[in-house]
Amino acid sequence: MSTLRYTLVVNGSVYGSQSARTAYQFASALIEKGHTLVSVFFYQDGVTNGTELTVPANDEFHLTKAWQQLAKQHNVRLETCVAAALRRGVVSQSEASQHGLLQHNLADGFEQAGLGSLAEAMLTQDRVVQF
């Protein structure tokens, strides 16, 4: 079996739909099958997966932490679209400084990137799958 290189695009919010959780399950399965997950690009409402201020109920799956653990264990880039993130209040430390904000809330392990990063992934990965 040949292994493939993947990038996932997640458009669904962290808890507003099943999209992000399904993407996480797909990511885990493809890694388990020996494929390489290069990056996950969070776009539109999907950028909410990258806020460190998400606090699910005690009996709920903590999706942001799950993404962080997956990224750390398997060297996966977690990228939030910077424009979509800023519109939705998900702000990195550098963006907070640039815009004169006192606080930032981008979770550890996530970075902010532009659409150029997604375009590059579409050109270089074997598969790009959108959720």
Curated annotation (Swiss-Prot):
Alphabetically ordered keywords of this record: Cytoplasm, Transferase
Record Pfam families: DsrE
Gene Ontology terms for molecular function: sulfur carrier activity; sulfurtransferase activity
Gene3D superfamilies, alphabetized: DsrEFH-like
Residue numbers annotated as active site: C81 (cysteine persulfide intermediate)
Biological role stated in the UniProt entry: Could be part of a sulfur-relay system.
Protein name, entry field: Sulfurtransferase TusD homolog
Taxonomic lineage of the native organism: Bacteria, Pseudomonadati, Pseudomonadota, Gammaproteobacteria, Vibrionales
Gene: tusD
